[in-house]
Amino acid sequence: MKVLFAVSECAPFAKSGGLADVAGALPKELRRLGIDARVMLPKYETIAPEWKKKMKKVAELIVPVGWRRQYCGVEELRHDGVIYYFIDNEYYFKRPQLYGHYDDGERFAYFCRAVLEVLPEIQFQPDVIHCHDWHTGMVPFLLREQYRHELFYVDMRTVFTIHNLQFQGLFPRGILEDLLNLDGRYFTVDHLEFYGCVSFMKGALVASDLITTVSPTYKEEIQTAYYGERLDGLLRARRDDLLGILNGIDDEFYNPEADPFLTATYSVHTRERKQLNKRALQRQFGLPEWDDVPLIAMVTRMTAQKGLDLVTCVFHEMMSEDMQLVVLGTGDWRFEQFFSQMAAAYPGKVGVYIGFHEPLAHQIYAGADLFLIPSLFEPCGLSQMIALRYGTIPIVRETGGLNDTVQSYNEITKEGNGFSFTNFNAHDMLYTIRRALSFYRQPSVWEQLTERAMRGDYSWRRSANQYKQAYEQLIKKEEHTLVHG
């Protein structure tokens, strides 16, 4: 079986969020299952020179973008057994950031078209094209409407994964004819029209053979008005083609036994060495090196989605507890300013790093006792799984993948691997933090919690098997349709 991942970012080459981690880890795991999984992404300016040196040009062609004819180079690189194809066009991709440009609609209209145009040139004919988020949303739609009649494409199936339904790729109506070579009949409710705009995300939801989300709970949530971002009706209509498959983490990269970024590596059998990382973390943030004071951490995008309004609401009440707090992240200016001010207001209790720093993030996962994720919504979330892998106990709101991966500790049955609260309410969060702190002060309970956390399986193995089954059923379904018509 052959599968092509069409993505807008992929670790370790280009990353702005969790999508890159998925695109970097899942194809590797699928290859271990015997699937020829390859990845296609733009060749961004920001890709490190050491990767660019390893690329070799395998094709050149012209890609139509409306009436324009744009150059397309294809460069190939092999890494960890996976073949990556980079779509090269300096006009579109020689930019300082991956996204956020005035012409993102044109950039990704070009990329979606290039994905399909390139395949015959590189002589790769996938059984399944697996697209991710709005940036590649037009691939399934263009395949269905403009390419499916050609012999080369006739048997190709499409899977579309929703990583975050909030970002939909909305553009003016004129993009249809001008950039996508689609006429006005496609600007209807049952095609691409979405409240007066063209929606790339909707194109994928309408045309893909299978739709997946990144956790079972998020799959259910997005079929409701509260989480559905005005697409819940369409998703309910396609519920028979909708799957929720939990993301995993790259357990080779996030491995406390061999992590090069840690002060001290450790395993489930040498958990006492975790304390060395805690002291190093306290030292790094200028906090007193107290072993018996619980250290809570957040590694987060500083946005309202991540529940930071809850934290700002009860911050001073949190600070009345005997605890320390470390925060790493960047995002909305108001949150950056708030946490910077709190670090100054509570010296010795609060440490803040504005920005993202991979080695420091690993040190935080290893050095903290508790990890706070109070998200408004969270399609999957990787942070809670990374924290669990490092024996750092998560405090989460019960939404999306957080609900699927963190089971709240039950003092009667002694089951659970973290702490959780249901309502998006600051004092519910505060109560849960206080509950977690009370169990931190019970060493026998805490030992059980950290051991259970570290023994959990958060890898891609289970998820990769589910994707393999989904691909196989899709191909089988198509063969059945062809035979029985």
UniProtKB/Swiss-Prot annotation:
It catalyses: [(1->4)-alpha-D-glucosyl](n) + ADP-alpha-D-glucose = [(1->4)-alpha-D-glucosyl](n+1) + ADP + H(+). It comes from the Bacteria. Pathway: Glycan biosynthesis; glycogen biosynthesis. ADP-alpha-D-glucose binds at residue 15. Keywords: Glycogen biosynthesis, Glycosyltransferase, Transferase. It is an enzyme of class 2 (transferase). GO terms for biological process: glycogen biosynthetic process. It holds the Pfam family Glyco_transf_5. One of its GO terms (molecular function) is alpha-1,4-glucan glucosyltransferase (UDP-glucose donor) activity. InterPro entries: Glyco_trans_1 (IPR001296), GS/SS (IPR011835), Starch_synth_cat_dom (IPR013534). Its EC number is 2.4.1.21. The keyword Transferase applies. Synthesizes alpha-1,4-glucan chains using ADP-glucose. HAMAP family: Glycogen_synth (MF_00484). Belongs to the glycosyltransferase 1 family. Bacterial/plant glycogen synthase subfamily. This is Glycogen synthase. It comes from Geobacillus stearothermophilus (Bacillus stearothermophilus). The gene is glgA.
